[in-house]
Amino acid sequence: MERINRLRAQVGASAASPPPPGGSADVFVSLRDASCPQHVYDAVLSPAALEFVAELAAAFQPQVEQLHARRQARRLETEQHGAMPHFLEEMRAIREDETWRIDPQPRALMDRRVDIGDVSPANRELLLRALNSGAQGVQVDFDDGHCPTWNNTIKGHFNVLQAARGLLEVSGQQVVENPALLVIRPRAWNMDESHMLVNGRVVPGALFDFAMHLFHNGKHLFETEMGPFLYLPKLEGYTEAALWRQIFEYTEKMLDLPHGCIKATVLIENIFAVFEMDEILYELRHHSSGLNCGMWDYTASIVVNFRKRPECLLPDRQQYVSMKSDFLRYYMDLLILTCKRRHAPATTGMVPFVLSELPTGISQAEAIEKATSSKGVEALAGSDGALVYDLALVEPVATVFTEKREKIGKAGRSAPLVFDEAFFAEKLLTLPRGDVTLKSVEMNVRVALLYVLHWLYGNGTVVVNGCIEDSATAEISRAQLWQWVYHRVPIADASQRVDAALIAEMLRKVLHEESKRKPHQPQYLEAARQLVFLISTMRFPPAFITTFLQDQEALVESLQH
């Protein structure tokens, strides 16, 4: 271990240490929304809580700015000079040293079979039902499944505060005696909390959510052996893991928590991060609860970063993109292999089915069979668990992982893959070949449009064709639309190519169908249509759809008034 520490010092694997606290910060916080009860606002945004958020934001402002500068520089390098992700030569010693492991998991995290995913904390009833579902954990989601209006965010943190203490109650229903774990997913680094400024700078959404949760709930969760546990979204490399490690260590000292008590599962949702998984685990080795596959965000990151390259043109995702596709199967295999080498939990993606809203022709039994079959393959590959959205899927999916674990225990695991860098580097960047149909264009338009429409209403998810759609699936949908328009992709079942005119036509079609299916205010429909057309055709598309939508905050407020 001393050798590894020397190597890390030599290559500068970690960012500089944060400055010591000192001096009072200049803090601005937006006023309470009229729909937010005063006691909720006061409980979350107490003077002491705001002081802690401000201190954390001020202490780490330079590192956060460096993070964004690194991201911008890499995107420029990728766009203009054709840079591609690769295993870092300067970190080879850490990857090849088989002696280091992450710290052992606390008792509460020994069973990771099923978490409920995409649970917006602003949805009080869903949060309570998820806690009482029998799952091992609840992904309390301030990111992909959450629309971060000021009202939603404050209510979300209030609900988490109550849930952590077993006080959450809805219509007489209370938290059961042994609820699922609260595993908080703060916003990703691309999102800001625009309603709080410290020293004239907007507080990163990631720091706001993390600091609020740890300040209000960290010590209580630790003392009850229920946390504090996190999911970390959209990291783009090990330097960002190093930043989180520093934030954890700083917070543990400030709140008088034991070193290493904060545990985090990193969501591998970025093409650059998949080449740095060993390094990510190493940086977080005292705080790690493993890695998780985030399939659609990961796939979208490939399309967004390499959107102009013909060899990175992604076909119809409904037909050609799944965990059976080579580039995703080897992504999962490498994640599991990396975790097993480092004694870290490895979990896989979310089953999106909403059983009560399946389309005609698909029975609940068929959906459950499809879910358990896919998770069975992942379990045999070495996954320790997965996520589901529908609470009725908890038991069948948990049973799959239990049975596969017992089967592997009796028979022994098959020969593991060898960590062959050249092999994985090729497979991870070899995308499937296939065509695009009118149906696939319409499906992407539908998902993007309905997601944006519900975002304008203040919701972070929407059900489409029996599946929950969040920002991850909206991300891949809009990214593919842009890529298909840019490359003027031919349509297999029509004598035309994908262009702006077709996108406009599809938007009108889907909009008309949606207005007949469910009443909507016309101004919301029109705003959603214009936003999806813009993000599908603009010269410089944003890195994240949520950043683009957050920038429309003034539009959202004007619609509501």
PLM segments and residue spans:
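Surface-exposed peri-terminal alpha-helical interaction modules
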Residues: H68-A69, C467
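Intrinsically disordered, low-structural-confidence terminal and linker regions
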Residues: M1-R32
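Subunit-assembly interface segments of extracellular/virion macromolecular structures
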Residues: Q66, E77-Q80
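Active-site-surrounding "flap" and adjacent substrate/cofactor-binding loops of secreted or lumenal enzymes
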Residues: I154-V170
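Conserved N-terminal beta1-alpha1 strand-loop-helix module at the mouth
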Residues: P62-Q63, A69, R113-I116
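Conserved alpha/beta-domain cores
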Residues: G23-S35, Y41-E55, A59, G82-W100, ...
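Long, compositionally biased, charged low-complexity segments
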Residues: I4-V11, T78, S515, V556-L559
